[in-house]
């Protein structure tokens, strides 16, 4: 072979040779070109109150005694100016932030119902002995029975909160009363100046000497007004909602209207029969809301697993509601729209607690299903379906903290209770995308957007406060959630755990002393979460 031929063959082999380094470089290029899908972060609450972070769930952060930055079974929330109020049921107190918290777990400024932040006893530990004279029942078996005793500056199981005409009202549920301060309290343990439901601030007997009337209360829960004039109170264990047409001026001021009963002296669930449910009956109502612009009244009828809506504020006792949500009609009262306690669904409710309404729609805390439901428009038809669920990944889920025991996230809920909605209209440069469920069977979500060429309406800037009672915290949402997709095996829905089949959510361990012959909660019919 000539030298020229050998040279050509060598050049040909060199041209086809690829070094190991070059091969590695090509592999790296292939890897760089592969697109890694970005994980969509699930939207959750933006702020937590009562815990150091979103993962914590223990009452009083696991300590034996409370502090200025802890909560135990928080129930309701109120905001007035820059001030924030929370009813801390487990610690028998109301805590106040004089400046709205900006960081997780910020300490509060004031405490009502206790002398200081380390105290947590019901009525500050005051007790009395129940006998024939004090009970008014004439039952000798009650002689010597010890009960908690109220005084003017004590609180027992606080519930609803509202600032009305610049004055703070607190539903002191365990003392069967509503107390009012002459303004906004400025000192720890400051005493209120007026009481509803009792003759004076030292009494705490259920139904005011044992007689049901227009001025008595029995474990009241929610309170609301929107016009600093009409006051509504959910009188839970009297199975009615009381309405005052004007601001009370003295202790024991009588209400003007009763909803859920035919008269002011009646107090039976569903007017005497659990199955006698109708548009004018109630069973353990817990939440109330009055929208002054539309004059609509909203009542959470917890024992009947529904929300009732009156299109105009009732002027007379016993007026029937116009719309029902959570049931297909006014004659139904089954949990989860008749599907039972085991199965959450889009159309039903299971022991709901509170309702709030604004320009952006309606929210209901569906406590037994560990979720909050959202309607983009206030319902106008019976059984109208919600558009979005908060706290769960789908309408069919109901486990506390999505089944992870002892650990929460910014997106989960456990026993959600009272709520507060604050709205402010503001112009935004970009369109805020609002996640809404599709109507298909896969429960996929889509984004409601404005088509090109259309003018974008001002999007609501809001804060939704949720008293997440089971997680001993209050969470604040400022965006509607876009639930992340989770792969889930087809498995049977597990029944919610109940401690006492006969105890309602928000109910108390005290016996009902005034209806011995009444079976208010038949076994297995009204379980508590």
Feature annotation, model-predicted:
Residues 30-56, 77-79, 84, 463-464:
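An edge-strand/N-cap motif at the start of beta-rich repeat modules
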Residues 61-79, 125-165, 209-226, 272-291, ...:
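Signature of short aromatic-glycine-proline-rich micro-motifs recurring in repeat-based ectodomains
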Residues 70-73, 90, 107, 154-157, ...:
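Beta-rich catalytic cores
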Residues 82, 166, 228-229, 293-295, ...:
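Short coil/turn segments that connect the beta-strands within blades of beta-propeller domains
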Residues 89-90, 99, 173-174, 183, ...:
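Short loop/turn segments immediately following the C-termini of beta-strands
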Residues 97-105, 181-190, 245-253, 310-319, ...:
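Short loop/turn segments immediately following beta-strands, especially the blade-tip
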Residues 370, 418-426, 457-491:
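Blade-level signature of beta-propeller repeat domains, shared across WD40, Kelch, NHL, RCC1
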């Amino acid at each position: 072979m000539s030298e020229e031929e050998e040279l050509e063959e060598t050049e040909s082999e060199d041209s086809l040779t690829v070094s190991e380094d070059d091969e590695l470089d090509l592999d790296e290029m292939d890897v760089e070109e592969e697109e890694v899908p970005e994980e969509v972060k699930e939207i959750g609450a933006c702020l937590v109150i009562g815990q150091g972070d979103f993962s914590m769930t223990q009452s009083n952060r696991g300590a034996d005694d409370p502090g200025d930055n802890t909560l135990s079974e928080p129930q309701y929330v109120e905001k007035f100016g820059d001030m924030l109020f929370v009813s801390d049921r487990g610690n028998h107190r109301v805590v106040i932030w004089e400046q709205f918290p900006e960081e997780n777990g910020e300490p509060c400024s004031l405490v009502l119902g206790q002398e200081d932040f380390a105290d947590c006893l019901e009525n500050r530990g005051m007790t009395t002995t129940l006998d024939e004279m004090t009970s008014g029942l004439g039952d000798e078996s009650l002689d010597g029975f010890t009960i908690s005793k109220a005084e003017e500056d004590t609180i027992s199981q606080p519930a609803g909160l509202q600032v009305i005409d610049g004055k703070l009202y607190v539903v002191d549920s365990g003392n069967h009363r509503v107390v009012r301060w002459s303004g906004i309290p400025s000192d720890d343990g400051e005493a209120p100046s007026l009481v509803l439901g009792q003759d004076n601030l030292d009494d705490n007997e259920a139904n005011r000497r044992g007689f049901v009337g227009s001025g008595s209360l029995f474990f009241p829960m929610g309170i609301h007004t929107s016009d600093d004039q009409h006051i509504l109170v959910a009188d839970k264990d009297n199975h009615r909602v009381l309405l005052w047409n004007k601001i009370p001026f003295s202790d024991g001021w009588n209400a003007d209207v009763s909803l859920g009963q035919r008269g002011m002296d009646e107090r039976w669930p569903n007017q005497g029969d659990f199955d006698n449910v109708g548009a004018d009956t109630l069973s353990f109502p817990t939440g109330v809301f009055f929208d002054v612009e539309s004059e609509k009244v909203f009542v959470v009828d917890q024992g009947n697993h529904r929300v009732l809506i009156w299109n105009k504020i009732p002027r007379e006792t016993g007026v029937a509601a116009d719309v029902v949500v959570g049931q297909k009609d006014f004659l139904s009262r089954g949990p989860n729209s008749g599907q039972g306690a085991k199965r959450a669904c889009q159309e039903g409710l299971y022991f709901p607690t509170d309702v709030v309404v604004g320009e952006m729609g309606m929210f209901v805390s569906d406590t037994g299903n560990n979720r909050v439901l959202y309607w983009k428009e206030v319902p106008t038809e019976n059984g109208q379906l919600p558009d979005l669920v908060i706290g769960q990944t789908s309408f069919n889920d109901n486990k506390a903290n999505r089944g992870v025991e002892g650990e929460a996230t910014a997106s989960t809920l456990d026993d959600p209770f009272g709520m507060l909605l604050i709205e402010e209209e503001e112009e935004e440069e970009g369109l805020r995308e609002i996640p809404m469920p599709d109507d298909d069977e896969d429960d996929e979500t889509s984004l409601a957007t404005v088509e090109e060429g259309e003018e974008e309406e001002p999007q609501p800037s809001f804060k939704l406060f949720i008293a997440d009672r089971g997680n001993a915290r209050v969470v604040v949402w400022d965006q509607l959630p876009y639930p992340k997709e989770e792969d889930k095996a087809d498995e049977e829905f597990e029944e919610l755990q109940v401690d006492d089949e006969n105890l309602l959510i928000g109910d108390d361990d005290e016996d009902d002393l005034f209806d011995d012959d009444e079976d208010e909660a038949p076994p297995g019919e009204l379980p508590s979460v």
